[in-house]
Amino acid sequence: MVTVAELQALRQARLDLLTGKRVVSVQKDGRRIEYTAASLDELNRAINDAESVLGTTRCRRRPLGVRL
């Protein structure tokens, strides 16, 4: 069972990834490689799953139609 705290941690991880705070760099033999510790698609999928379990999904409302 997913907790609200775990959902918040997933959202923070996504924010960190998007803002570049989760970039890992390795330097060896004069070569430098940078990569992210998690993929954005995996984080979004995990967040959607957690929201579904907790019942906190954000349902979009239909646009209101205008009748004249």
Swiss-Prot record:
- Quote the Gene3D superfamilies the UniProt record gives: Head-to-tail joining protein W
Enumerate the SUPFAM superfamilies for this protein: Head-to-tail joining protein W, gpW
Q: Which cysteines are joined by disulfide bonds?
A: none
- State the compartments where it is located: Virion
Q: One of this protein's Pfam families, by short name?
A: gpW
Q: What is its main location?
A: virion
**InterPro entries recorded:** GpW (IPR004174), GpW_sf (IPR036626)
Q: Which GO terms describe its cellular component?
A: virion component
Q: Which UniProt keywords apply?
A: Late protein, Viral capsid assembly, Viral release from host cell, Virion
What top-level branch of life does the organism fall under? Viruses
Biological process (GO) annotations held by this record are: viral life cycle
What this chain does, per the entry, is described as: Plays a role in morphogenesis of the virion head after genome packaging. Presumably interacts with the portal vertex to stabilize the packaged DNA within the head after packaging. Probably binds to the head-tail connector protein gp8.
Subunit architecture:
Monomer in solution, assembles into hexamers on the prohead. May bind gp8 and portal protein (Potential).
Return the NCBIfam families for the record.
Answer: phage_HTJ
**Family, as annotated:** Belongs to the lambda phage gpW family.
This protein is called what?
Head completion protein gp3
Native species: Enterobacteria phage P21 (Bacteriophage 21)
Task: Show the taxonomic lineage.
Answer: Viruses, Duplodnaviria, Heunggongvirae, Uroviricota, Caudoviricetes
